[in-house]
Amino acid sequence: MDDENNYFFDIDEEHEEKRSFVVICYDIQNNKRRYRFSKFLEHYAIRVQLSVFEAELSPKTYKELVAGIDRFTNEDDSIRLYRIGGGREVQSWGKDSGSKIEEVVII
């Protein structure tokens, strides 16, 4: 990737492998809980859509984020965290659509 298109991943190669790019999206029914969750996410990530955040996190910060998400979990809601570049891991909390993705392609 050339430097002008690499604005989000502007880190040196030594630390590049240790950080993960994550996308967090959610569907929380309760207004108060949804507001509190978005405020929580603002400490870790950048809002890119109404219910979608992106972040580039160290392993320690990633673990903190995941641990904090548990406080907002409700069986009627859906919170999904996509870890891109770090094992291609997807975690979800609450209501699950039941869909299983065999292969993920990010364009």
Protein language model regions, located:
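Basic nucleic-acid-binding interfaces
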Residues: 1-4, 8-23, 29-107
